Amino acid sequence: MAEERSQRSRDRSREEKIDDGMIEKLVAVNRVSKTVKGGRQFTFTALTIVGNGEGSVGFGYGKAREVPVAIQKSMEYARKRMANVSLNNGTLWHPVKANHGAASVFMKPASEGTGVIAGGAMRAVLEAVGVKDVLAKAIGSRNPINLVRATLKGLEDMQSPTHIALKRGKNVRDFSHGS
């Protein structure tokens, strides 16, 4: 019972499903100040992830004087910039390395029932895209924006064996292990 409650509260923490079936996740909110003649002016930035849980995902970064407006802007931007990712029954096709700036990510497929073993910003992207089982590690910078970009870059660069076979003009069976 207690385990169920903790699981429920952890899932609810930064996730929201809307009418159109999209999964929205708030990754980070940051307060930025600008010093002017009359004092400090505060603005807020929001980093959000939007996905359909079936291979489509996008991220947005919004800025505004108030937090809700910044979140709304970033959600709209994320919906405009959706990318499609090829998945293999809820996991990845092959191990992937990608980086953006000093943030590097390493993701590898996991067997069914493993779950999403990833931290912070990477977890939000992987859950929104619909990955159920994956082992992931962030290396280098832990800047949320760069981690999100690196994770998306890795997922977009991943190719299914069928796609590789088509590109090379070969049969998929030629890529099986042990041949």
Swiss-Prot record:
The keyword Oxidoreductase does not apply. The keyword Disulfide bond does not apply. GO terms for biological process: translation. It holds the Pfam family Ribosomal_S5_C. One of its GO terms (molecular function) is structural constituent of ribosome. Residues 22-85 form the S5 DRBM domain. The N-terminal domain interacts with the head of the 30S subunit; the C-terminal domain interacts with the body and contacts protein S4. The interaction surface between S4 and S5 is involved in control of translational fidelity. With S4 and S12 plays an important role in translational accuracy. Located at the back of the 30S subunit body where it stabilizes the conformation of the head with respect to the body. Part of the 30S ribosomal subunit. Contacts proteins S4 and S8. Belongs to the universal ribosomal protein uS5 family. This is Small ribosomal subunit protein uS5. It comes from Xylella fastidiosa (strain M12). The lineage of its organism: Bacteria, Pseudomonadati, Pseudomonadota, Gammaproteobacteria, Lysobacterales. The gene is rpsE.
